[in-house]
Amino acid sequence: MRMRPEDLYPPAGGRPARRPIDVRSPGEVAKGALPGAVALPILDDDERHAVGLVYAREGQEAAVAVGERVTAPHLHARRAAWQAAADGEPSVFVCWRGGMRSDLARTLSERPETPTVEGGYKAIRRHLMDGLVPSLARRTPFVVTGPTGSGKTDLLHRLAGHPGL
């Protein structure tokens, strides 16, 4: 089952319709985290690097075999984490391009009803960025200035959470 990025996030961001379970590596998440997501990687950075090298040299089948071998010792703990994250509220699995890692996490978590995102993180990012420009164009910038101690920070704290911000 697949979910479109625009069905997960409203234009220009906001609370996702489902809780994203981000199975990208920690390094990938560090370069761009998803709003409201819980990061539970299927591969750590070293494992991802090893799989990527094999993929480039030997192809997908060999890379999948390496991925299975390097993740086997951690699989039980990762499965339990994905299951716990998918319990209690509607969730969706997300990887880089919406392919093998999110499909594998869904299968291994024994949650076939939990969708994955079409196009993964890349498609979500594109969707959010496309919605950002029109959203910003509809707003009037407001600049807060003043000398030190004039209450600028207090004002910002009082306005925190205001729908216009």
Model regions: which residues?
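Cytosolic catalytic domains that perform sulfur/thiol-centered chemistry
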Residues: M1-P115, G131-R138, F142-D154, A160-L165
